[in-house]
Amino acid sequence: MMKNKIPKMPSSNLSNDQVLRKNELLSNEVKQIVLDGNHNVANLLEDFSDASFEARNIGQAAKLYSQRLQTDTSIIWALSGSLFSAGLRQITIDAIRKNCVDVLVCTGALFEQDMLEALGHKHYKCETNVDDRELQNLMIDRVYDHLLDEIALRQVDLTFKKISDEIPNGIYSSRYFMQYCGEWLSKAEKAQDSVMQAAFEKNIPVFIPAINDCSVGIGIALSQKQGKQIIIDSIKDLREIALMKSECGNSGIIVVGGGVPKNYAQDSVIMAEMLDYQVEKHNFGIQIGTEDIRDGGLSGSTLKEAISWGKNDQEIEDVMVWGLSLIHISEPTRPY
């Protein structure tokens, strides 16, 4: 049987210099991903780095993170969004225990999610077209495609109140208060493992710049209502993270989402400079998110844009991953 003939390559009118330049530009091949019985997530991420589109960014981000974990670099995670309730809580716990993160800067909502599961409750899958009026009547809260029990969440509020009741009167940073929460959970009967406890046990500072905007703040407010003299001083936070940044030397940031945690983690450099500390700018970064850079919001702004603000080093090594954090985060490892 006669085989089909493939047409010849069309000719071109390119000059020799153009041909050389074209060959240079077309020298870095997009490699096809081959799955076999020996593949795991690490292998897949390595293959991604030679693919294209966001797969390449994911692979390059994983490679950059892996390389920096082998160096004396302090790594700050800036986390926002419903990451823990959506399934990334255990990865965060494991990353803390495996020395893959040195500082957490987070939204407070993450720690109401963390506390909810520490108390033995769960988050539950649902369809996005569920009747929210019915959910309200049933005291069920919805986060897009998953649910939580409002009664359980109120237990979370009351647990943070109890912790506030027991801490000595005083003025604290959010970092100190979260450390106290982790210590409290480590001694709590029947408490499940948690990010707070892991951070306490590994001496990882946790900063919540907007701590009033969550169950932690509600618990503290309830305690204050009954006469407790406890104040969370956000400016004390600023001073502490500035001092921390000045002492940590080389540093980089892993940004998931954006918002206040992203800005706070980056701004630690400026805070330290303004407080007359000798400080190095962040020299590597990875950002994972879906926000568009064109709307001018902080969450979507690139890590290179922050160079102009003096937050990141002019030679920062960074990777921007445009996509959902839940898909793109996997567990890293560190040699010590």
Stretches with model-predicted labels:
Residues 2-62, 66-69:
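N-terminal glycine-rich anion-binding loop in soluble enzyme alpha/beta folds
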Residues 61-74, 198-200, 243-250:
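Glycine-rich phosphate/diphosphate-binding loops that line cofactor/substrate pockets in enzymes
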Residues 74-82, 104-106, 253-256, 286:
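Short glycine-rich or small-residue beta-strand-to-loop segments that form or flank ligand, phosphate
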Residues 92-157:
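A generic, well-ordered mixed alpha/beta core segment in the N-terminal half of proteins
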Residues 134-216:
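Ligand-binding beta-strand-loop-alpha-helix segment within the catalytic cores
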Residues 209-252, 261:
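Active-site rim loops that border cofactor/substrate pockets in soluble metabolic enzymes
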Residues 280-304:
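Short, flexible loop segments at boundaries between secondary-structure elements
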